[in-house]
Amino acid sequence: MQDRIVRATAANGGIRLVAVLTTESSLEAKKRHDLSYLTTCILGRAFSASLLLASSMKIMHGRVTLRVRSDGPLKGLLVDAGRDGKVRGYVGNPDLELDLVKIDSNKYSFDFTKALGTGYLNVIRDSGIGEPFTSTVELVNGNIAEDLASYLYHSEQTPSAVFIGEKIQNQGIICSGGLLAQVLPKKDTDPLLVSLLEERCKEVNSFSEDLFQSKDNLLSLIKKIFPDIDDESISEKARSQEVSFKCKCSKQRSLNAMNMLDKSELEDILKKDGNAELVCEFCKNKYLINYEEIKLMIENQS
């Protein structure tokens, strides 16, 4: 199933609802970064969180960056997502594995809290106009969903509910995604809407299972929480949008990065190696900068 974002509203436009599926994007990241099951889930959660935030941006080239700086063995993460549905990212320790934690008599979960440890979630919103807006909040417990909800509460003062989860089987992750429900800014002082949001979200007992059952129809996932969504509240074109792992790196960007080195540094590379290989942190694509290209950079700085 193609990864996708689906949007809807409820309560006569007072509540915004967004659901996202990030299974294929998470698996692509696993392949590119050689992730463990644990880090695949963590990065998938961060993909879902960043795409949910980016979904509200008004311009298609708007972007959201999530960065976690913490003292846990994951060694942080960085994710970049666009309003266009493109997402990329990486973690500091891709092959991290930890013992599962028991959550009830027959269920176990990854230890996200131990993996991330204590630290901060940094959110950067870049609309492409003016300076990006940056906000930082302390990590709540490292499960990404509650950390994102904390950001929305403290930085945007928006009554929100965030659900993020995944489904794992022996072969690995088979489903990843999330859902965001928000009282819209002009309605956020309406106690009835805030109460409605709280009551509906209390009825969610197992989001990961709901996500798995609705992975082929995200609108049905939204309707499980808000069965009375507004009819035709959003145009069909705007309601559904494809999502994919996509990096912006290129050979030209690599050349530009090399060109920022001092002449002496370029000469040293030319003398020792004769060429340079640059590896993109986000997607692991490799770009070879050959002898002639480095020589031209040196000549241009002379």
UniProtKB/Swiss-Prot annotation:
The keyword Repeat does not apply. It comes from the Bacteria. GO terms for biological process: protein refolding. One of its GO terms (cellular component) is cytoplasm. Keywords: Chaperone, Cytoplasm, Disulfide bond, Redox-active center, Zinc. Under oxidizing conditions two disulfide bonds are formed involving the reactive cysteines. Under reducing conditions zinc is bound to the reactive cysteines and the protein is inactive. Its main location: cytoplasm. It holds the Pfam family HSP33. Disulfide bonds join C247-C249, C280-C283. It is found in: Cytoplasm. GO terms for molecular function: protein folding chaperone; unfolded protein binding. PANTHER family: 33 KDA CHAPERONIN (PTHR30111:SF1). Belongs to the HSP33 family. Redox regulated molecular chaperone. Protects both thermally unfolding and oxidatively damaged proteins from irreversible aggregation. Plays an important role in the bacterial defense system toward oxidative stress. This is 33 kDa chaperonin. It comes from Prochlorococcus marinus (strain MIT 9301).
